Amino acid sequence: MSVTKSYEEIIDFIAAGSTPEGVVAFHPSEALQQRVAELVDQSKQGSISAEDQAELEDYLQLEHIMIMAKARARQNLGN
């Protein structure tokens, strides 16, 4: 799985016409969660390749964007 999959999941979610409720409820797929867990484990063990490190960093940026989007969606919902 490449970082492209991370981007594809978020792009598909946005393109489907997300609502504030949908943004709050969004979670990455199980496959993506497993891939990220693998990358984190590799990073902790010091055995991560440069390509995998870049993939992990890209995912972390996307995760930050989604955290911020969820916070904004909660504000829009009045929570």
Where are each of the predicted segments found?
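Extended, charge-rich alpha-helical interface modules
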Residues: M1-N79
